[in-house]
UniProtKB/Swiss-Prot annotation:
This is Myelin P2 protein. It comes from Oryctolagus cuniculus (Rabbit). Keywords: Acetylation, Cytoplasm, Lipid-binding, Transport. Forms a beta-barrel structure that accommodates hydrophobic ligands in its interior. Belongs to the calycin superfamily. Fatty-acid binding protein (FABP) family.
Length: 132
């Protein structure tokens, strides 16, 4: 994984996030809070363990994982998922599976920004972060 991912990132733009949350099955009240949140994402690495911490006024979440190894995750909207994150062509690709459903979250670096692309049932959400 590129060390360029490491550090603190702040959300600067979000496109289609409400539709993505709807596709996930997130309720109206939680979607409203999620749309208002402007999270910071802190990515760190210790040995071969990567940690992604998301902090916002809505909720803080943290996942720690090894690339290519499945782990259990409780998401900000309280889904209990089996997740796996791999590194492909410089991008961190995450697959979350729960209740027979699946979503993908791809994190890639473009022009010094972290572009996060979330896909669920044909809905695509793009969130862009800048390094703090």
């Amino acid at each position: 994984m590129s060390n360029k991912f490491l550090g603190t990132w702040k959300l600067v733009s979000s496109e289609n996030f409400d539709d993505y949350m709807k596709a996930l099955g997130v309720g109206l009240a939680t979607r409203k809070l999620g749309n208002l949140a402007k999270p910071n994402v802190i990515i760190s690495k210790k040995g071969d363990i990567i940690t992604i911490r998301t902090e916002s006024t809505f909720k803080n979440t943290e996942i720690s994982f090894k690339l290519g190894q499945e782990f259990e995750e409780t998401t900000a909207d309280n889904r209990k998922t089996k997740s796996i994150i791999t590194l492909e062509r410089g991008a961190l690709n995450q697959v979350q599976k729960w209740d027979g459903k699946e979503t993908t979250i791809k994190r890639k670096l473009v022009d010094g920004k972290m572009v996060v692309e979330c896909k669920m049932k044909g809905v695509v959400c793009t969130r862009i972060y800048e390094k703090v």
